[in-house]
């Protein structure tokens, strides 16, 4: 394989420029000056000599020839004969390089050990670092095979040391129990370890207790007491991942017992965190569902009472009005007055009023308490978890301890002075009976809802979990922040003092508010009515006829292609399949399973499934499909493959013309679920109350998908906006981000702005949006009646450093972005309020600009339309079984969603490759194709793609 190295002009000037001394040295030592000079410059530039497989760029040879005042007709040939060796030795000595011998190998080994102590275990990364190190030491690089062998040897030794260290954290008596996890009880059974890999199928008491059992089993094994602090978290995560992918047979058959134990320990260590997060999610979800069910039941009862008592409320109204009018003139005694009305009718009216009042005042809580015995099926065990709390929740912790004693039988009833200050308002109103005594069941249910609230805010927490830790443990700690503060402010390009930023924002606010005020009389988009904005027209983006015609013309010239051929060709064009690596390091070189891997990707992306693809594909067996899927398809490998596809797409000139890289968008696409799944929920808008669904939330820029997340349709989308943007590892570099209206909160406006992604959502519910002044003394004419208040600037100023601390934590991935955003939304401390206040500044500026700037609105609509084009393609690809998921396993769902994004990106690459040819051809024919028209055409057209039928992999 021949390798041509790209050389920039700067590299030519630095490494390929010959000094007078160089020229004299070349003249004195060689007759073949260009060949000799090339070897010398190559060693200087890359730390090694030219090999027979290297191709020297013409620019470098031409540059050397000019300096040597010579000409050349062909590239020199570099051989390995004795004369060439002598020449290389002269060059090595002249440049002060040392040959790579045993001494240098030992030196490299010592250096590698120093890097391994820093927990750098990636062999590719270490090889690149070793090459840089050897060059800095002026040691001639050995062959890649030799270098790889040295690195592998040291890495394997280090990993073996880690295995021993990890295994020794567990007592020998407990280590023996690990073997039971990978040994089935009988031939047909699954090993217990396999059960721990599953995700919850539903949110109910049975599933809750099942996962509490799992956690207790891990706890009893002593895993939570293992001190792994000396092991780098990346090492633990890597070994834990192997525990997820190795099956029980592979683990049992491992030659190294220590490696087996280390993998299982790390897997259990990380799985315990996941299970705790599942338990908390289920706890909150069950309470949420119970509350929702109670509200629905109350709504139905309210309608029933209203129908039953139709017309019975008027007598009460007449009675009251008459009482006040006659009392005013003192015409009748009370007895005379009452006899004017029918007693039975009034009593019926009173009963109806009492029924309505009971429903409104305590109906929801009474219905929730009716589920008390159901909640008790798991709540006792939930309270045995090691819950901790911030200093302000002392009474809640005291109440938890009281309830634990009550559950254990240590006390018979709640004390009279039981704390109630922590209860949510709806429970405080109903906590006592008519005698003023605390109602135990109401108090206990109120406590559970208080737990839900405080866990969501991160003030009540489980320190052993991953996402439900103390809020301030998910961001920079106080000491690390003191050390990092100065550097992080510089990296974020944020001022140390808030007043510096406020000066800029004040000027921008005044400018856009003044412009919005001045243009309001002629604004045909919105008007002000009853103190709120109202749309006066549909401001949808109009696509010119020329664009429609051009789209049809390009579509008509697109070659017909089957989806499997498209995927194979896009993979070849981009080299993306190099991103797929096996989850284990094979003992010997294995052939890359190209066809089975392509078929497995399509099986997931089309929802056909592996067995379905095995039946529909020619040249592929089900065994090879399942092997390729299990060994190669993982979140990190699919993400890497997607990265390569997107980056290749950006190399086409037409990509710059057709797509505006300034914007990215994100949106959720709903898919029905045929199996029970803990993230699924009803989505009446599309599926009524008969079928549950989940959302696949994707981030798109220039048509390329760079983020894929599986979320619940019952959750707000806003927290997941930031996750995709911060985890983007492609060359896409959007400056603005857009979503639909439901995709934002004031916290999100603040965080996106401070992280360098100004937020431009589409506003559909403008009348429901509040905007605020930053200076209550300023007047903006007719706009004054829509302002909801004045932003507390002093609050932001006082908490500015803490705000930046959270922003820096998000930027550096200290915790998943959606976790921090969700906690912020539930917190009521001053820092959270300050972030919300800052978000109100940014949101107010944006809304005022949005209503007055038609070009901004159309730009936002255009990019969201491109995102919608990707949704249409995804719907077309994911066709089987009505696009419904038939699995309840989170990883399988995530694999399907990620492979769908991968194939979508493959379509983008393939289409762009051919659109480039078509547009070039049309322009050569004299067609005037404007870039502004191309930008209104999505490259994700798919009419030419054949998706259904038999899949032919035999000739790929």
What are the functions of these language-model segments?
Residues 47, 613, 664-670, 737-742:
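Short, conserved catalytic/metal-binding motifs centered on acidic residues
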Residues 716-735:
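Short, basic/hydrophobic alpha-helical segments
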Residues 785-956:
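Long, compositionally biased intrinsically disordered regions
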Residues 2-503:
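Long amphipathic alpha-helical coiled-coil/heptad-repeat bundle
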Residues 737-747, 765-770:
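Acidic, metal-coordinating catalytic cores used for nucleic-acid/nucleotide bond scission
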Residues 507-616:
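Structured, charged N-terminal subsegments at the starts of enzyme catalytic cores
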Residues 585-589, 605-663:
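Electropositive nucleic-acid engagement tracts
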Residues 569, 573, 577-579, 589, ...:
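Active-site cores of enzymes that catalyze phosphoryl transfer or operate on phosphate-rich substrates
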């Amino acid at each position: 394989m021949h390798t041509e190295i790209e050389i920039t002009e700067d590299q030519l000037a630095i490494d390929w420029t010959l000094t007078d001394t160089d020229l004299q040295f070349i003249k004195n030592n060689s007759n073949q000056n260009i060949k000799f000079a090339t070897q010398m410059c190559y060693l200087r530039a890359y730390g090694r000599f030219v090999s027979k497989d290297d191709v020297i760029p013409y620019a470098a040879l031409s540059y050397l020839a000019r300096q040597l005042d010579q000409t050349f007709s062909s590239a020199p040939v570099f051989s390995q004969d004795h004369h060439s060796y002598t020449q290389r030795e002269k060059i090595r000595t002249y440049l002060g390089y040392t040959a790579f011998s045993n001494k240098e190998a030992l030196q490299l080994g010592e250096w590698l050990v120093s890097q391994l102590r820093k927990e750098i275990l990636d062999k590719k990364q270490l090889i690149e670092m070793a090459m840089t190190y050897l060059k800095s030491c002026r040691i001639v690089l050995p062959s890649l095979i030799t270098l790889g062998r040295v690195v592998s040897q040291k890495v394997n030794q280090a990993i073996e040391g880690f295995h021993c260290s990890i295994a020794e954290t567990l007592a020998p008596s407990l280590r023996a129990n690990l073997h039971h996890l990978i040994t089935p009880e009988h031939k047909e059974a699954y090993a217990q370890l396999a059960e721990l890999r599953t995700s919850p199928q539903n949110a109910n008491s049975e599933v809750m207790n099942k996962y509490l059992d799992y956690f207790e089993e891990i706890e009893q094994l002593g895993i939570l007491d293992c001190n792994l602090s000396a092991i780098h978290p990346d090492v633990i995560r890597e070994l834990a991942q192997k525990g997820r992918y190795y099956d029980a047979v592979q683990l049992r058959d491992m030659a190294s017992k220590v490696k087996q134990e280390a993998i299982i320990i790390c897997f259990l260590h990380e799985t315990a965190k996941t299970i705790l997060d599942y338990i908390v999610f289920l706890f909150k979800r069950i309470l949420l569902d119970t509350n929702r069910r109670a509200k629905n039941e109350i709504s139905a009862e309210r309608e029933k009472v209203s129908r039953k008592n139709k017309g019975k409320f008027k007598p009460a109204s007449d009675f009251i009005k008459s009482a006040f009018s006659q009392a005013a003139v003192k015409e009748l005694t009370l007895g005379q007055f009452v006899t004017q009305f029918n007693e039975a009718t009034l009593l019926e009216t009173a009963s109806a009023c009492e029924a309505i009042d009971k429903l409104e005042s305590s109906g929801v809580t009474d219905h929730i308490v009716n589920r008390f015995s159901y909640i008790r099926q798991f709540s006792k065990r939930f309270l045995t978890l090691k819950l901790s709390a911030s200093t302000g929740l002392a009474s809640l912790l005291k109440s938890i301890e009281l309830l634990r004693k009550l559950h254990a039988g240590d006390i018979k009833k709640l004390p009279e002075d039981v704390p109630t200050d922590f209860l949510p308002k709806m429970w405080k109103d109903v906590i006592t009976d008519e005698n003023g005594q605390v109602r135990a069941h109401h108090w206990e249910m109120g406590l559970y809802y208080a737990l839900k609230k405080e866990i969501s805010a991160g003030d009540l927490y489980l320190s052993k979990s991953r996402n439900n830790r103390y809020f301030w443990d998910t961001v920079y700690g106080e000491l690390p922040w003191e050390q990092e503060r100065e550097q992080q402010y510089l990296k974020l390009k944020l001022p140390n003092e808030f007043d510096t930023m406020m000066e800029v924002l004040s000027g921008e606010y005044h400018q856009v508010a003044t412009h919005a005020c001045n243009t309001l009389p002629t604004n045909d988009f919105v008007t002000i009515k009853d103190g709120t904005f109202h749309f006066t027209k549909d401001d949808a983006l109009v696509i010119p006829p020329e664009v429609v015609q051009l789209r049809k013309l390009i579509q008509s010239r697109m070659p017909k292609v089957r989806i499997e051929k498209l995927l194979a060709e896009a993979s070849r064009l981009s080299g993306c399949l190099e991103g797929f690596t096996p989850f284990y390091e094979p003992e010997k070189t294995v052939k890359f399973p190209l066809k089975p891997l392509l078929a497995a990707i399509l099986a997931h992306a089309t929802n056909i499934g592996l067995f379905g693809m095995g039946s529909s594909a020619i040249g592929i067996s089900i065994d090879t499909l399942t092997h390729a899927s299990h060994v190669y398809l993982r979140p990190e490998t699919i993400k890497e493959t997607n990265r390569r596809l997107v980056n290749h797409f950006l190399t086409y000139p037409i990509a710059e013309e057709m797509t505006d890289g300034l914007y990215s968008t994100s949106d959720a696409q709903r898919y029905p679920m045929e199996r029970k799944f803990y993230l699924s929920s009803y989505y009446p808008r599309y599926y009524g109350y008969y079928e549950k669904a989940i959302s696949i939330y994707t981030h798109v820029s220039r048509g390329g998908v760079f983020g894929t997340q599986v979320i619940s349709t019952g959750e707000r989308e806003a927290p997941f906006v930031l996750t995709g943007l911060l985890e983007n590892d492609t060359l896409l570099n959007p400056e603005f981000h857009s979503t639909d209206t439901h995709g934002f909160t004031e916290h999100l406006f603040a965080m996106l702005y401070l992280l360098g992604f100004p937020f431009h959502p589409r506003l559909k519910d403008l009348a429901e949006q509040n905007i605020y002044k930053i200076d209550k003394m300023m007047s903006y004419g007719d706009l004054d009646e829509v302002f909801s208040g004045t932003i507390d600037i002093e609050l932001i100023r006082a908490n500015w450093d803490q705000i930046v601390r959270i922003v820096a934590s998000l930027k550096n991935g200290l915790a998943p972005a959606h976790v921090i955003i969700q906690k912020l939304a539930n917190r009521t401390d001053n820092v959270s309020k300050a972030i919300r206040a800052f978000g109100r500044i940014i949101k107010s500026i944006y809304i005022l600009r949005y209503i007055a700037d038609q070009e901004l609105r159309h730009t936002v609509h255009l990019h969201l339309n491109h995102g919608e084009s990707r949704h249409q393609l995804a719907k077309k690809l994911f066709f089987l079984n009505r696009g419904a998921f038939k699995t309840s396993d989170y990883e399988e769902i995530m694999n399907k969603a990620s492979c769908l994004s991968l194939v979508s990106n493959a379509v983008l690459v393939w289409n762009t490759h051919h659109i480039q040819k078509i547009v070039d051809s049309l322009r050569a024919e004299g067609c005037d194709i404007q870039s502004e028209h191309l930008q209104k055409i999505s490259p994700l057209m798919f009419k030419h793609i054949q998706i259904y039928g038999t899949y032919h992999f035999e000739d790929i």
